[in-house]
Design a protein with these regions (language model features):
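Extended, low-polarity segments enriched in aliphatic/aromatic residues
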Residues: 1-303
Length: 303
């Protein structure tokens, strides 16, 4: 008779409309993910407050020996991921591995992944526009007497949303390796989710925005629509999607296009890095392949 599918996600680390199951379900409904439109139920995997988790071994884990994953996700017999592939201000791009690793982590699991470093403000670059404070869900950003942003590290969750919100590169990670550490931990969390059961993965490489989908102020797409990719191997899938984006022509009136048009811009010949220069997107793929989750080699079959 087939399986009984359900749609799922875990609560976010930062406050907002997905910080608990009740508001999360309302958010899902407002975005069209509801039984009346999809034909299946929606379950928030880590429960009402994001504490319903399972500690799962990470196969060959180097940075995380165990992962804290939403219980409903680990209770499922089969795992299918559906990902919107886009740019990302901390990880370079948000693909299948990020969707699984960060998306399936409980709130505590997300905190572990983000723990390498909290953002800081280079006040000489701050324009006092207050955009970062509006984006911060933790009320961690205030302004001093000179109207320069100040981050309260006791309130900061380390989610990095303020980095993407700043148009003037005034906010950066305190730890030089923080983004790379985040990438590698995400890969290991994704491996914990997928290990030991059938999995299949689909990526929609469309509306390729420069930053994470959690940004309400996200900018115009940086690249034209490319298509829909699918694979049993999430590592090969992310590599194929990334390669397709690297070979695409940047859209002129986008964050990427405008960066490339700046006089004296230090071009990286990398559409992700030229959109968000302080990222190291290859680390996720390297780590996932290293611990045996999949391979970066692929054969592209067009249909």
């Amino acid at each position: 008779q087939g399986g009984l599918p359900f749609l799922t996600d875990c609560n976010t680390l930062y406050p907002g409309s997905r910080k608990n199951a009740l508001e999360h379900l309302t958010c899902a409904q407002l975005n069209g993910f509801w039984p009346m439109t999809t034909g299946c139920q929606v379950i928030i995997a880590d429960g009402l407050r994001g504490t319903d988790e399972v500690e799962v071994p990470v196969p060959n884990g180097e940075y995380c020996k165990t992962a804290k994953i939403g219980r409903a996700i680990m209770d499922a017999d089969i795992f299918i991921s559906l990902t919107h592939f886009k740019g990302h201000e901390s990880t370079g791009f948000g693909g299948t591995l990020k969707n699984i690793g960060m998306g399936c982590g409980s709130r505590a699991g997300k905190m572990i992944q983000h723990a390498a470093g909290h953002p800081e403000v280079q006040q000489s670059l701050c324009r006092g526009c207050h955009r970062c404070a509006k984006e911060c869900g933790s009320d961690a950003i205030t302004y001093d007497a000179n109207n320069k942003a100040v981050i309260d590290q006791t309130k900061c969750k380390g989610c990095g949303r303020c980095i993407g919100a700043c148009n003037f590169d005034a906010i950066y990670s305190q730890c030089d390796s923080a983004n790379e550490m985040l990438d590698r931990k995400m890969a290991e969390y994704a491996a914990a989710v997928c290990a030991g059961r059938p999995c299949f993965h689909i990526s929609l490489v469309q509306d390729i925005s420069p930053n994470c989908d959690c940004h309400c102020e996200n900018d115009a797409p940086i690249l034209p629509d490319i298509g829909i990719f699918a694979s049993f191997d999430p590592v090969a899938l992310d590599q194929a999607c990334a390669d397709a984006c690297l070979n695409a022509q940047p859209l002129p009136n986008s964050q990427l296009g405008q960066n490339l048009a700046k006089p004296g811009w230090n071009c990286h010949h990398d559409n992700f890095k030229d959109s968000n220069p302080n990222i190291e997107w290859k680390a996720t793929l390297e780590q996932a392949e290293k611990i045996g989750m999949g391979t970066r080699q692929y054969v592209l079959k067009k249909v």
